[in-house]
Curated annotation (Swiss-Prot):
Main location: cytoplasm
Role played: Required for rescue of stalled ribosomes mediated by trans-translation. Binds to transfer-messenger RNA (tmRNA), required for stable association of tmRNA with ribosomes. tmRNA and SmpB together mimic tRNA shape, replacing the anticodon stem-loop with SmpB. tmRNA is encoded by the ssrA gene; the 2 termini fold to resemble tRNA(Ala) and it encodes a 'tag peptide', a short internal open reading frame. During trans-translation Ala-aminoacylated tmRNA acts like a tRNA, entering the A-site of stalled ribosomes, displacing the stalled mRNA.
Domain of life: Bacteria
Keyword hit for Disulfide bond: no
Family: Belongs to the SmpB family.
GO biological process annotation, one example: trans-translation
UniProt xrefs under PANTHER family: SSRA-BINDING PROTEIN, TMRNA-BINDING COMPONENT OF TRANS-TRANSLATION TAGGING COMPLEX
Pfam families xref list: SmpB
Sorted UniProt keywords: Cytoplasm, RNA-binding
Protein name as it appears in the record: SsrA-binding protein
GO molecular function annotation: RNA binding
Localization annotation: Cytoplasm
Gene Ontology terms: cellular component: cytosol
Amino acid sequence: MYFCGYMKNSINIKNRKAKFNYEFLDKYTAGIKLAGTEIKAIREGKANIAESFCEFNNHELFVINMHVEEYSHATHFNHNPRSQRKLLLQRRELRKLEKEVTNSGLTIIPLRLFINDRGLAKLQISLAKGKKLYDKRETIKDRESKRRLDRIQKEYK
């Protein structure tokens, strides 16, 4: 199957809040079960994973609250923008993730939505542990001190 050059790796939607709110443990790349209009909207870049999370239902993993805008050129047979979408992983990965989530109280967060070289939509997910408030404050302090140092170094060059 041949795809145009503009489509290759052109879509890269990130969850920027996740890095600040969570500490990542393991990362996985999962396929997504999508309708025709959903993949077309994603290829246009009209998706948002900022407030989404993953949840198990009957030993299957679903991404919840991922917003995929309705496809502009579709007729009345369009998709629901906030519907649950099934994630496709290998069985052993699913078992491992489900065990970690139920026993350790960890959560699964989507990090990045992208189109791979074969033109398929993939979702990079991570097993994550929520940061405490003081950890978030420390992250902010570190970032500000790094910016300050960079500014000072720039002045003396």
